From Swiss-Prot:
Protein function: This protein specifically catalyzes the removal of signal peptides from prolipoproteins.
Protein name: Lipoprotein signal peptidase
Recorded GO MF terms: aspartic-type endopeptidase activity
Record-linked NCBIfam families: lspA (TIGR00077)
Membrane disposition: Multi-pass membrane protein
Keywords carried by this UniProt record: Aspartyl protease, Cell inner membrane, Cell membrane, Hydrolase, Membrane, Protease, Transmembrane, Transmembrane helix
A Gene Ontology term for the protein's cellular component: plasma membrane
Species of origin: Neisseria gonorrhoeae (strain ATCC 700825 / FA 1090)
Annotated S-S bridges: none
Main EC class the enzyme belongs to: hydrolase
Active site: D122, D140
Family: Belongs to the peptidase A8 family.
Gene Ontology BP, a term: proteolysis
Length: 164
């Protein structure tokens, strides 16, 4: 195995870890909660719950007729394929590759939900008084943190390329 391939193994392990952690956490919630049941963890701030999201992040397009399930499925697969290719071609520095792997893992976790359940399982609910942040899951967290890392990588490399 070439050193280039073996050096990328850590990114595939990270993506796989994101998928496993996401699916395990969803299995635990699905096994323990009834739909819309809430258990307070931190008073007036954080609950565990079980809700279904047929749309995208923050229930975007959730009230549509069902076409969005396939749209987001295809979108997640296409973005993941692009990111896999980018990692393999060394189009990112290390921080960008970590971010890409996190996005791939998170997107894959939500794709698995769409294929198995027809919707994404969300269970983390943060709120303050009467303001509620939309429920989300571990996969969403990996996607968001991964996106931030990819953007930071892009900013750093833009500055580096201007120096040369």
């Amino acid at each position: 195995m070439s050193s280039s391939v073996s050096s990328k193994t850590r990114y595939w392990v990270l993506a796989l870890a994101a998928i496993v952690l996401d699916q395990w956490s969803k299995w635990a919630v699905l096994s323990s909660f009834q739909y819309r049941e809430r258990v307070n963890v931190i008073p007036s701030f954080f609950d565990l719950t079980l809700v279904y999201n047929p749309g995208a992040a923050f229930s975007f397009l959730a009230d549509q007729g069902g076409w969005q399930k396939y749209f987001f499925l295809v979108l997640a697969v296409a973005v993941s394929a692009y990111l896999v290719r980018a990692i393999l071609r060394d189009e990112f520095a290390a921080l960008g590759k970590i971010g890409a792997a996190m996005i791939i893992g998170g997107a894959s976790g939500n794709v698995i939900d769409r294929l198995i359940h027809g919707h994404v399982v969300d269970f983390l609910l943060f709120y303050w008084q009467n303001w509620f942040y939309p429920a989300f899951n571990i996969a969403d967290s990996f996607i968001c943190v991964g996106a931030v890392l990819a953007v930071l990588d892009n900013i750093v490399h833009r500055k580096d390329s201007k120096k040369t």
